[in-house]
């Protein structure tokens, strides 16, 4: 699996054997790449800046983490996948109870209709997704100001819900130590989780890291591990 980026000769390759890092020291190109990736999570169209080599949509494969502490674990993409998996796992006994709940809700609607002196509308059709929304089920990860634990929580969440998703962390190295990064890399490799670190400055290097550096003059090269 590869990503190509306009103005960068070297493609970004992804593997379960190493983590991938793009170090862009040209601030204008860095900003252009980041804007494209963030926008891709909300808009679906062909991008001129960043593309998968097989034409796959960025939003279908990338989970963008621009800010570890404010990452939205309740995003539509995450919640919809979680609901889908829950609905596949729920057994018949639960479904029978759901029918009882649906009957109760219908009776409440009928009572409201009989009790008011004007016409009303109320729902009579419910599905499991509706009841999950009522429960407001959503993931929970460490909320305290511990960046490393938040990163672990995000990796665990995405790895549990999705197959073949790439987690894209932006400027994470600037917030953690070399030792913390090493532990994060080990976690990703052990879980076979594809990750992509995008950095705007020169930083430390890990032996399990494949790094593409783009200097200020837009010259791209692979950095030795």
Task: Tell me what each language-model feature is.
Residues 159-177:
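Conserved P-loop NTPase "ATPase switch" module shared by AAA+ and STAND
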Residues 178-225:
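Alpha-helical oligomerization segments
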């Amino acid at each position: 699996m590869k990503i190509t980026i306009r103005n960068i000769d070297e493609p970004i390759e992804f593997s379960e054997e190493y983590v991938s890092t793009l170090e862009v020291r040209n601030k204008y190109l860095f900003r252009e790449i980041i804007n494209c990736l963030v926008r891709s999570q909300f808009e679906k169209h062909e991008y001129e800046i960043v593309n998968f080599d097989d034409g796959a949509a960025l939003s279908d494969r990338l989970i963008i983490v621009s800010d570890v502490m404010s990452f939205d674990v309740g995003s539509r993409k995450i919640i919809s996948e979680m609901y889908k998996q829950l609905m596949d796992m729920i057994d018949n006994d639960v479904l029978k109870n759901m029918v009882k709940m649906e009957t109760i809700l219908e009776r409440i609607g009928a009572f409201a209709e009989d009790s008011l002196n004007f016409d009303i509308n109320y729902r009579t059709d419910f599905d499991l997704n509706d009841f999950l929304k009522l429960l407001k089920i959503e993931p929970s990860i460490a909320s305290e100001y511990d960046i490393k634990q938040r990163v672990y929580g995000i990796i665990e969440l995405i790895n549990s819900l999705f197959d073949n998703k790439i987690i894209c962390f932006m400027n994470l190295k600037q917030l953690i130590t070399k030792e913390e990064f090493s532990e994060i890399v080990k976690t990703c490799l052990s879980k076979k989780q594809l990750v992509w670190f995008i950095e705007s400055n020169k930083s430390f290097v890990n032996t399990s890291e494949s790094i593409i550096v783009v200097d200020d003059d837009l010259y791209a090269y692979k950095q030795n591990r």
